[in-house]
Amino acid sequence: MEMQGTRQLKVQQQQAWDALNNPEVLKVCIPGCDRIEASGENEFSMGTALKIGPVSAKFSGKIMLTDMNPPASYTLNFEGQGGVAGFGKGTAAVELMPTPEGCELRYTVNAQVGGKIAQLGQRLIDGVAKSLSEEFFKRFDAETERLYPVQDSAAPVESPASQPQAQGWPNWVWVVGAVVVAALIYTMR
């Protein structure tokens, strides 16, 4: 399965990169996320609880970042397991392009899924994937507005999510994580 998309962000490219590399920001923004931890250089583990139609499951996953070109692009390799509910693996190419209004996030996800969730109807899976993606970006927009207010975009505002970042994880990785979760759901048909 392949999924592509773009999203206009209200923050500058570097600010988006920084926010996407902040595990606390990502934890707040990814629906159902209860854990994001560094497990090596440019490697992370995460836990997410999701409900897709009649199927509820806790997914554990690994993310590895490659082809990093800060603050412009990277490739995210992922795999996730939800027990009998299903599994998913794949890659996501992510780009942050500067625009006059802030920056544009572009992504292309290639994923494979299987298990019980793969047996659900395509329309249900598509709807959940779209809903998760929209919820992530809604939360991300709100969080970046708190961190980088329009009236003073040079000085971040202190908030619980603006604590020191874990080394090696750009903020866009978390956005990609949300896209990956949505892609996993989308491909589990």
Positions of PLM-derived features:
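A conserved amphipathic terminal alpha-helix motif
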Residues: 116-156
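Hydrophobic ligand-binding cavity/cleft-lining segments
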Residues: 1-43, 51, 168, 174-189
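Intrinsic-disorder/low-complexity, polar/charged segments enriched in Ser/Thr/Lys/Arg/Asp/Glu/Gln
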Residues: 2-6, 43, 58-60, 73, ...
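Glycine-rich portal/gate segments that line the openings of hydrophobic small-molecule binding cavities
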Residues: 38-79
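Beta-strand/loop substructures that line and gate deep hydrophobic ligand-binding cavities in soluble
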Residues: 80-127
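Hydrophobic/aromatic beta-strand elements that line small-molecule binding cavities or substrate pockets
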Residues: 5, 34, 61-67, 90-98
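Short, Lys/Arg-rich cytosolic juxtamembrane segment immediately N-terminal
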Residues: 162-169
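Hydrophobic pocket/interface hotspot
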Residues: 16-20, 26, 65, 107, ...
